[in-house]
């Protein structure tokens, strides 16, 4: 099965072509300050040309549904739903926090991916490996990073994600020596991971929606002033 996956939920844009039989075929990842609407279709076209495939070769489409950038999520979901609809192929929507956590196989401590939500806030959840399988231990959440970590000070935890990179000093202040940080490349979301997770998942094209988890900053400001 050939899977085309896309991730546009953060500043990083990524597209990957993945075979369920042989693994990753090709991947394009861009961490540049351009809107995903400008480059995601270009990345998909280039990826297909470089790997000598066409869109009709794809058996399944997969996409990050968030949380993260509201605009980025909307773009990615719209693009992949459009491709799945036009080709009549299956679709899968994968949570961004699951994607980031899945990118490491750290087994001797818990894993907390943090996606930046600005102003020392983040999207987060907590994971650990049980019998070789990654298991989510918390609900997906959003809020003050300090408040979320307050009752976790005594645990050894591996942090990753753009929020962990941005607020590394804050996390160190809270956690002390119990905080470990993944190398920077593991904190970048990768579409190839989305593709791998999506192998055993299938969603309804017409009901698949973005997973925002919180209201956009503009909406929060409007409510605050009301």
Label the model's feature ranges.
Residues 1-65:
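N-terminal beta-alpha supersecondary unit
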Residues 32-35, 90-187, 212, 217:
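Surface "functional belts" at beta-alpha junctions
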Residues 37, 41, 80, 97, ...:
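A general structural signal for well-ordered alpha-helical segments in protein cores
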Residues 47-51, 86, 104, 194-201:
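Stable alpha-helical structural segments in soluble proteins, enriched in small hydrophobic residues
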Residues 62-96:
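DPxDG-like acidic metal-binding loop motif
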Residues 180-226:
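Acyltransferase
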